[in-house]
């Protein structure tokens, strides 16, 4: 355990009124942790097509290995998110300032 990270996690938990917190080294890791806590094999996530390349790879390839299906939609059509959803949808994923659009 990194003592600096441990202090950060304790302080964030205290600020948020939580019992614990997790600090990670990148946004991509944070995204992976969040999705893996929401979805399991057989579930799906509806995602924008406009993503950082590494995140797109994570969602499309790595999560598929865990049995989590990704459904990619055009973010220019907000209704596409609802249309792609079904009873197995556990989350919607989008980047507010996607890397390809910066």
Question: How does the language model describe each region?
Answer:
Residues 25-26, 50-51, 76, 102:
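Short beta->alpha linker loops
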Residues 57-102:
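PLP-dependent aminotransferase-class I/II
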Residues 37-55, 74:
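Conserved PLP-anchoring active-site segment centered on the Schiff-base-forming lysine
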Residues 15-19, 39-42, 87:
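Short helix-loop-beta connector
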Residues 11, 34, 80-84:
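CheY-like receiver
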Residues 1-32, 54-62:
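Conserved N-terminal alpha-helix of the aminotransferase class I/II PLP-enzyme fold
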């Amino acid at each position: 355990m990194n003592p600096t990270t441990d202090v950060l996690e304790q302080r964030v938990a205290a600020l948020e009124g939580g019992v614990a917190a997790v600090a990670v080294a990148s946004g991509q890791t944070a995204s992976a942790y969040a999705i893996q806590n929401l979805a399991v094999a057989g579930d799906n996530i509806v995602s924008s097509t406009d993503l950082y390349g590494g995140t797109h790879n994570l969602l499309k390839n790595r999560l598929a290995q865990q049995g989590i299906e990704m459904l990619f939609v055009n973010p220019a059509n907000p209704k596409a998110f609802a249309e792609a959803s079904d009873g197995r949808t556990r989350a919607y994923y989008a980047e507010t300032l996607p890397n390809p659009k910066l």
